[in-house]
């Protein structure tokens, strides 16, 4: 059976960090929209330049651009060969969630788990300011958290209502949080 997983949570909550460990344990590709966009920006692609203008202002990249990139990535051979994926940073709203569900249905797949890493704003703010990314200024961090709460939090209810949401307290260190994730994914 596939292990198709979405990681949800505020920016800086540890989605990417925990997903990277899951890659080692479960041999699933980690698909991070943030990494895709940062790579495109570094290479000054057309998409990268468009994404940069949104990200520099702390805003989300428009759905139509993001949906297309994610669908292309989910269709690549390594994802098909692995029998699953870990999505980090997508979907960010119910429109993207509907697009993902529709795409997965078109390839006879479905989501197996949506893991919501729940942490306080103080925790995620401190983590983001401590990671040293160019776009992590105090003002941009505060704005990103506000945007993410408005856009992402309805997803928590969306997936809770579908019965696929698993909430994990992510206020602690990775050494405390990750074993809970590993146990959950092992039982899928």
UniProtKB/Swiss-Prot annotation:
The keyword Endoplasmic reticulum does not apply. This is Adenylate kinase. Residues 32-61 are annotated as: NMP. InterPro entries: Adenylat/UMP-CMP_kin, Adenylat_kinase_CS, P-loop_NTPase. Keywords: ATP-binding, Cytoplasm, Kinase, Nucleotide biosynthesis, Nucleotide-binding, Transferase. The keyword Phosphoprotein does not apply. One of its GO terms (molecular function) is adenylate kinase activity. Catalyzes the reversible transfer of the terminal phosphate group between ATP and AMP. Plays an important role in cellular energy homeostasis and in adenine nucleotide metabolism. AMP binds at residues 33, 38, 59-61, 89-92, 96, 133, 144. It is found in: Cytoplasm. SUPFAM superfamilies: P-loop containing nucleoside triphosphate hydrolases. Consists of three domains, a large central CORE domain and two small peripheral domains, NMPbind and LID, which undergo movements during catalysis. The LID domain closes over the site of phosphoryl transfer upon ATP binding. Assembling and dissambling the active center during each catalytic cycle provides an effective means to prevent ATP hydrolysis. Pfam families: ADK. It comes from Oenococcus oeni (strain ATCC BAA-331 / PSU-1). GO terms for biological process: AMP salvage. ATP binds at residues 12-17, 131, 172.
